């Protein structure tokens, strides 16, 4: 009974969520697009001509937002071609419906064959921005969940260290709780500037927080 009551309450909140309604109206696949939008508007992360990698991209709302942003500021040549001014690579273990102008690679970004596909798209350019909305499956056991969250953040940090340009940026989702301070310290070890962001589009009951790191301390 309690579970059914919880599900009914969540469904009611979801249906009446203004960001859900806005996403449906504006064609985004998930309300998460507005979290990235708010952070981008505050921190000016996305600019024309950039190479941007979206980790854990499915269902694709973050890539949709980036695509829309890069199409607004595109050069005249890109406009004639109907494309975007920049490069977007989305990666996920799960399948994702195609998005115009977004290169999607399905697979584990730690594996050589996936990295080879990424490098084929990127060429000899370094990545300007890595964004990650990845989240592990949580068990409700605090210690276990903290380890899983930290592991996902570690994967994004390692990817950023290997692929970002020196003045690049990494934005990842994490959760307040056990292990949060350790994740922040890892960001501070790797980046010159670190900030936490809690966009209004994050649900009030959610402990999710986004950590932004800029300018690598030890670029490869």
UniProtKB/Swiss-Prot annotation:
Superkingdom of source: Bacteria
Residues engaged in binding S-adenosyl-L-methionine: 60, 62, 92, 108, 133
Transmembrane segments: none
Ranges in coiled-coil conformation: none
Molecular functions per Gene Ontology: rRNA (uridine-2'-O-)-methyltransferase activity
Gene3D superfamilies: Vaccinia Virus protein VP39 (3.40.50.150)
UniProt keyword annotation of S-adenosyl-L-methionine present: yes
Active site residues per record: 173 (proton acceptor)
Keyword rRNA processing assigned: yes
An example Gene Ontology CC term for this record: cytoplasm
Subcellular location: Cytoplasm
Catalytic activity: uridine(2552) in 23S rRNA + S-adenosyl-L-methionine = 2'-O-methyluridine(2552) in 23S rRNA + S-adenosyl-L-homocysteine + H(+)
EC number: 2.1.1.166
Keywords, comma-separated and alphabetical: Cytoplasm, Methyltransferase, rRNA processing, S-adenosyl-L-methionine, Transferase
InterPro entries: RNA_methyltr_RlmE, RNA_MeTrfase_FtsJ_dom, rRNA-MeTfrase_E, SAM-dependent_MTases_sf
Purpose: Specifically methylates the uridine in position 2552 of 23S rRNA at the 2'-O position of the ribose in the fully assembled 50S ribosomal subunit.
Family that this chain belongs to: Belongs to the class I-like SAM-binding methyltransferase superfamily. RNA methyltransferase RlmE family.
Descriptive protein name: Ribosomal RNA large subunit methyltransferase E
Organism: Paraburkholderia phymatum (strain DSM 17167 / CIP 108236 / LMG 21445 / STM815)
Phylogenetic classification of the source organism: Bacteria, Pseudomonadati, Pseudomonadota, Betaproteobacteria, Burkholderiales
